[in-house]
């Protein structure tokens, strides 16, 4: 799951 600030 992509969360704000995470570039995965």
Swiss-Prot record:
Alphabetized UniProt keyword annotations: Disulfide bond, Secreted, Toxin
Maturation and modification: Contains 2 disulfide bonds.
Tissue specificity comment: Expressed by the venom gland.
Predominant localisation class: secreted
A single cellular component GO annotation: extracellular region
Single GO MF annotation: toxin activity
Entry's localization field: Secreted
Functional note: Has a vascular smooth muscle spasmogenic activity.
Note: The peptide is constituted by 125 AA.
The name this protein goes by in its record: U28-ctenitoxin-Pn1a
Source species of the chain: Phoneutria nigriventer (Brazilian armed spider)
